[in-house]
Amino acid sequence: MSSALTLQPVRRFSGEINLPGSKSVSNRALLLAAQARGVTRLHNLLDSDDVRYMLDALKALGVRYQLSDCRTRCEVQGLGGTLSAHGALTLFLGNAGTAMRPLAAALSLGLRDVILTGEPRMKERPIAHLVTALRQGGAQVDYLESDGYPPVRLHGGFNGGEISVDGSVSSQFLTALLMAAPMAAEETRITILGELVSKPYIAITLAMMRAFGVEVENHAYRHFVVRGGQVYQAPSDYLVEGDASSASYFLAGAAIAGGTVRVTGIGRHSMQGDIHFADVLEKMGAQVEWGNDYIACTRDSLHGIDMDMNAIPDAAMTIATTALFAKGPTTLRNIYNWRVKETDRLAAMASELRKVGAVVEEGTDFLRIEPPAQLQAAQIATYNDHRMAMCFSLVALSGTPVTICDPGCTAKTFPDYFRQFSALCHPR
């Protein structure tokens, strides 16, 4: 794809889309299947950069799998135990947090030296809270460049026991510990320090561990107990849910310029917290319909809101650009963890919203957006962040064209995004 893509004004946005698999679920499923006893057939696996980094890492660790030509079905021959390296090994994981954090914990159960590294931005994304927790359980972990950040060298040694972990920056640290804990020698008892962010992502982790045969004692998301000495059991077939975060752009498009858009692959029983993005659209005035395997949204007049968005941090970015089309200001609160994602999303979002004419107040953990009377044509910097590119595609639903720089960055989670988006666009 070219280095910039100009989207022309769209008159109407409507249709149906079947969602690609969830990134969060895909990488969890691959790691669980790799360590399980038996064969797991994964269906609707996401084909994206982040998932390819996980697949490449598992292959380097001796995991055997067969990937379909379309890369959405994968048959994994589980190891029936912990991942291990045959000799010293370095794994490059790009900017994939859903690979870096869980693999750091999983490989702390092994005996060989493994180095985990990635792109420059990955080396700016904190991992100290996870490393501190792993060390409490006996793991030997070295920082190779800057303390608290990748790259890290893992020497094994994690046995479980009493562990406390700070949950205030990223839920991925807790997810990593939970997924590794069943294979530790001892029972693992985890206590959460601070406010646990992105709690619905922990619900995903617990549900998936259950699907692979492991139960976790969950005491109000403040304390967790995991029995040691277990082996995950392959569920034979596992269907990866559609990506609820990806659904947000299409549902928002309908709320802004529908028509009606129906997204399939998720529904009222989805385990992903980001399905509640649709509830936020409803609070803003859109009409939403829920089915067992779909969510539909229809346009209505939108108004600004003031809400805590901690439970849906990724989908909340889409509310920031949807706010450009609402009457009155919108305030998104409790979103500090935007700052430690693929880029500092609070700063990036504030900067680009101002380009299209919005008045924006950027706080430490909040964003207040006042929409302009008329959106301005702009060239949007995407900061190598897939969600910035997809969020700002919605600007085209005004009477104004928008140019997206580096549109290919959507390959991280949704390589086909702009083709799918265009298929629902009815030009002016």
Curated annotation (Swiss-Prot):
<feature type="binding site">
    <location>
        <position position="24"/>
    </location>
    <ligand>
        <name>3-phosphoshikimate</name>
    </ligand>
</feature>
<keyword id="KW-0028">Amino-acid biosynthesis</keyword>
<comment type="similarity">
    <text>Belongs to the EPSP synthase family.</text>
</comment>
<feature type="binding site">
    <location>
        <position position="28"/>
    </location>
    <ligand>
        <name>3-phosphoshikimate</name>
    </ligand>
</feature>
<feature type="binding site">
    <location>
        <position position="345"/>
    </location>
    <ligand>
        <name>phosphoenolpyruvate</name>
    </ligand>
</feature>
<dbReference type="InterPro" id="IPR023193">
    <property type="entry name" value="EPSP_synthase_CS"/>
</dbReference>
<dbReference type="InterPro" id="IPR036968">
    <property type="entry name" value="Enolpyruvate_Tfrase_sf"/>
</dbReference>
<keyword id="KW-0963">Cytoplasm</keyword>
<feature type="binding site">
    <location>
        <position position="341"/>
    </location>
    <ligand>
        <name>3-phosphoshikimate</name>
    </ligand>
</feature>
<feature type="active site" description="Proton acceptor">
    <location>
        <position position="314"/>
    </location>
</feature>
<dbReference type="GO" id="GO:0005737">
    <property type="term" value="C:cytoplasm"/>
</dbReference>
<dbReference type="GO" id="GO:0009073">
    <property type="term" value="P:aromatic amino acid family biosynthetic process"/>
</dbReference>
<keyword id="KW-0057">Aromatic amino acid biosynthesis</keyword>
<feature type="binding site">
    <location>
        <position position="125"/>
    </location>
    <ligand>
        <name>phosphoenolpyruvate</name>
    </ligand>
</feature>
<comment type="function">
    <text>Catalyzes the transfer of the enolpyruvyl moiety of phosphoenolpyruvate (PEP) to the 5-hydroxyl of shikimate-3-phosphate (S3P) to produce enolpyruvyl shikimate-3-phosphate and inorganic phosphate.</text>
</comment>
<dbReference type="GO" id="GO:0009423">
    <property type="term" value="P:chorismate biosynthetic process"/>
</dbReference>
<keyword id="KW-0808">Transferase</keyword>
<feature type="binding site">
    <location>
        <position position="387"/>
    </location>
    <ligand>
        <name>phosphoenolpyruvate</name>
    </ligand>
</feature>
<feature type="binding site">
    <location>
        <position position="412"/>
    </location>
    <ligand>
        <name>phosphoenolpyruvate</name>
    </ligand>
</feature>
<dbReference type="InterPro" id="IPR006264">
    <property type="entry name" value="EPSP_synthase"/>
</dbReference>
<dbReference type="InterPro" id="IPR013792">
    <property type="entry name" value="RNA3'P_cycl/enolpyr_Trfase_a/b"/>
</dbReference>
<feature type="binding site">
    <location>
        <position position="23"/>
    </location>
    <ligand>
        <name>phosphoenolpyruvate</name>
    </ligand>
</feature>
<dbReference type="Pfam" id="PF00275">
    <property type="entry name" value="EPSP_synthase"/>
</dbReference>
<feature type="binding site">
    <location>
        <position position="23"/>
    </location>
    <ligand>
        <name>3-phosphoshikimate</name>
    </ligand>
</feature>
<feature type="binding site">
    <location>
        <position position="171"/>
    </location>
    <ligand>
        <name>3-phosphoshikimate</name>
    </ligand>
</feature>
<feature type="binding site">
    <location>
        <position position="172"/>
    </location>
    <ligand>
        <name>3-phosphoshikimate</name>
    </ligand>
</feature>
<comment type="subunit">
    <text>Monomer.</text>
</comment>
<feature type="binding site">
    <location>
        <position position="97"/>
    </location>
    <ligand>
        <name>phosphoenolpyruvate</name>
    </ligand>
</feature>
<feature type="binding site">
    <location>
        <position position="314"/>
    </location>
    <ligand>
        <name>3-phosphoshikimate</name>
    </ligand>
</feature>
<feature type="binding site">
    <location>
        <position position="198"/>
    </location>
    <ligand>
        <name>3-phosphoshikimate</name>
    </ligand>
</feature>
<dbReference type="GO" id="GO:0003866">
    <property type="term" value="F:3-phosphoshikimate 1-carboxyvinyltransferase activity"/>
</dbReference>
<feature type="binding site">
    <location>
        <position position="337"/>
    </location>
    <ligand>
        <name>3-phosphoshikimate</name>
    </ligand>
</feature>
<dbReference type="GO" id="GO:0008652">
    <property type="term" value="P:amino acid biosynthetic process"/>
</dbReference>
<feature type="binding site">
    <location>
        <position position="172"/>
    </location>
    <ligand>
        <name>phosphoenolpyruvate</name>
    </ligand>
</feature>
<comment type="pathway">
    <text>Metabolic intermediate biosynthesis; chorismate biosynthesis; chorismate from D-erythrose 4-phosphate and phosphoenolpyruvate: step 6/7.</text>
</comment>
<protein>
    <recommendedName>
        <fullName>3-phosphoshikimate 1-carboxyvinyltransferase</fullName>
        <ecNumber>2.5.1.19</ecNumber>
    </recommendedName>
</protein>
<feature type="binding site">
    <location>
        <position position="170"/>
    </location>
    <ligand>
        <name>3-phosphoshikimate</name>
    </ligand>
</feature>
<dbReference type="InterPro" id="IPR001986">
    <property type="entry name" value="Enolpyruvate_Tfrase_dom"/>
</dbReference>
